[in-house]
């Protein structure tokens, strides 16, 4: 059955990954030791997408945990779900990447990468029909960004026809952890544009805003942020893990969401938002879910979709919901907000429905949108990159690891191209599109 192999790299990736495994173990009725004590057959039916059934009736995640320093791994291992993972699947170095993309991609990370690929290969061989890979990492650091993108391109080489989805935490405008974030992020985006099939962009600042504005948490911890991310990851992967009336898998999602191969950076949202450990205080209805889901305040990336247009989007509903009601609501949203959807892709909203709600909720919805406003995010990083690169600030850390300045220039222009592509399709109209098609036809004939 369509398995997915999960990789988590770097500190951020491992913390988000741990939260994700905790969430879906709960949904499938597994305890911290991987023993099943659930209540419904639905939990078992497609357990094998993410879990391997081992001896002693234990379920083991198909997860590979990677880091260049042992700290985060130890934290995962000693956490409540530490015994869940297969001990051989922890692959770590000792030196750390020190927030340096070049260390993760070229020196330290490159030494460890073969060891990781062996584990990935072993996991892939244990699958009946591997659907693809998902990777959690941040783009601002050294290991998640540098080594994460190295792994993506290596896995791409070895499994060219499998899907590659990434959950990438992008640097946020106000909350910055390191000065060299713009460098690391630009170099990573340069890789993701080429090697990933779908990238779900998550942004710490947007998560902080949700925690403070919507959930009224005065001092959100990373635990609270990771809880939100794991809710989205669980939502995006629901239809792979549970039966439903309208299912989608990674490939179906990509086919419906990516109109042009380079434009595969998605904004994600989730409704209803609840804080960790808290439950919803009122009954939620489908209209409310759709309303909340399309609310800019619910987006987990700090770019406002009202400044751009949706090329495509997808809504995944969970719970006992009537299909008709969902379709009516989605049509309603499209009719009311026509200006936010490009008119040259008719019916560009895809819906999926799954009958099993997340724990503690009657129904929920996950939103994935391919909006041209994501360019704001790249623009912002690009401006910060340009400001530092103009003075060649901090560059010696990268060139010292064997990188060349050309690589920075290439990465910068690739990201600028991405921004202008998004802008071009934002402004495109139906008639223009027709002219372009005609022009292409004429060129073809001449050839």
Swiss-Prot record:
Binding site for GTP: 11, 69, 138, 142-144, 204, 226
GO biological process, one term: microtubule-based process
Cofactor(s) essential for the protein: Mg(2+)
Protein residues bound to Mg(2+): 69
PROSITE patterns named in the record: TUBULIN, TUBULIN_B_AUTOREG
Presence of the UniProt keyword Metal-binding in the record: yes
Subcellular location: Cytoplasm, Cytoskeleton
Gene Ontology cellular-component terms listed: cytoplasm; microtubule
CDD domains assigned to the protein according to its UniProt record, in alphabetical order: beta_tubulin (cd02187)
One MF annotation (Gene Ontology) recorded for this entry: GTP binding
Gene3D superfamilies, per the entry: Helix hairpin bin, Tubulin/FtsZ, C-terminal domain, Tubulin/FtsZ, GTPase domain
Domain of life: Eukaryota
This protein's UniProt keywords: Cytoplasm, Cytoskeleton, GTP-binding, Magnesium, Metal-binding, Microtubule, Nucleotide-binding
Function (record text): Tubulin is the major constituent of microtubules, a cylinder consisting of laterally associated linear protofilaments composed of alpha- and beta-tubulin heterodimers. Microtubules grow by the addition of GTP-tubulin dimers to the microtubule end, where a stabilizing cap forms. Below the cap, tubulin dimers are in GDP-bound state, owing to GTPase activity of alpha-tubulin.
Entry similarity comment: Belongs to the tubulin family.
Annotated PANTHER family: TUBULIN
UniProt subunit comment: Dimer of alpha and beta chains. A typical microtubule is a hollow water-filled tube with an outer diameter of 25 nm and an inner diameter of 15 nM. Alpha-beta heterodimers associate head-to-tail to form protofilaments running lengthwise along the microtubule wall with the beta-tubulin subunit facing the microtubule plus end conferring a structural polarity. Microtubules usually have 13 protofilaments but different protofilament numbers can be found in some organisms and specialized cells.
Protein name according to UniProt: Tubulin beta chain
Organism in which the protein naturally occurs: Penicillium digitatum
């Amino acid at each position: 059955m369509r398995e997915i192999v999960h990789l988590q790299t770097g500190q951020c990736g491992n913390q988000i990954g741990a939260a994700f495994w905790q969430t879906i173990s709960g949904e499938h009725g597994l305890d911290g030791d991987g023993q099943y004590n659930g209540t419904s057959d639905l939990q078992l039916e497609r357990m094998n997408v993410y879990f391997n059934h081992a001896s002693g009736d234990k379920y083991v995640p198909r997860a590979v945990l990677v880091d260049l320093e042992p700290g985060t791994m130890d934290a995962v291992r000693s956490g409540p779900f530490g015994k869940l993972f297969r001990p051989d699947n922890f692959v770590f170095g000792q030196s750390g990447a020190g927030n340096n993309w070049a260390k993760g991609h070229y020196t330290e990370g490159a030494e460890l990468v073969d060891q990781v690929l062996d584990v990935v290969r072993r996991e892939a061989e244990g699958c009946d029909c591997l659907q693809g890979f998902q990777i959690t990492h941040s783009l601002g650091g050294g290991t998640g960004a540098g080594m994460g993108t190295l792994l993506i391109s290596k896995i791409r080489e070895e499994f060219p026809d499998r899907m590659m989805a990434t959950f990438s935490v992008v640097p946020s405008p106000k909350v910055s952890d390191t000065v060299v974030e713009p460098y690391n992020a630009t170099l990573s985006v340069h890789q993701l544009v080429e090697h990933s099939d779908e990238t779900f962009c998550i942004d710490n600042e947007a998560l902080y805003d949700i925690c403070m504005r919507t959930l009224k948490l005065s001092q959100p911890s990373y635990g609270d942020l990771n809880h939100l991310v794991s809710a989205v990851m669980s939502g995006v992967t629901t239809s792979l893990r549970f039966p439903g009336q309208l299912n989608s898998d990674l490939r179906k999602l990509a086919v419906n969401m990516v109109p042009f191969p380079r434009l595969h950076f998605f904004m994600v949202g989730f409704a209803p938002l609840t804080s960790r450990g808290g439950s919803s205080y009122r009954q939620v209805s489908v209209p409310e879910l759709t309303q909340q889901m399309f609310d800019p305040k619910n987006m987990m990336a700090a770019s406002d979709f009202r400044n751009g247009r949706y090329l495509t989007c997808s809504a995944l509903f969970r719970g006992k919901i009537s299909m008709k009601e969902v379709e009516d609501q989605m049509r309603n949203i499209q009719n009311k907000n026509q200006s936010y959807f490009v008119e040259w892709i008719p019916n560009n909203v895809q819906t999926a429905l799954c009958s099993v709600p997340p724990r503690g909720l009657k129904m929920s919805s996950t939103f994935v949108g391919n909006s041209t406003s994501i360019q704001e995010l790249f623009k912002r990083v690009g401006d910060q990159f340009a400001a530092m690169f103009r003075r060649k600030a901090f560059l010696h850390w990268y060139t010292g690891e064997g990188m060349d300045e050309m690589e920075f220039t290439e990465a910068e222009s690739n990201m600028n191209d991405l921004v202008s592509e998004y802008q071009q399709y934002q402004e495109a109209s139906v008639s223009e599109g027709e002219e372009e098609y005609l022009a292409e036809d004429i060129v073809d004939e001449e050839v």
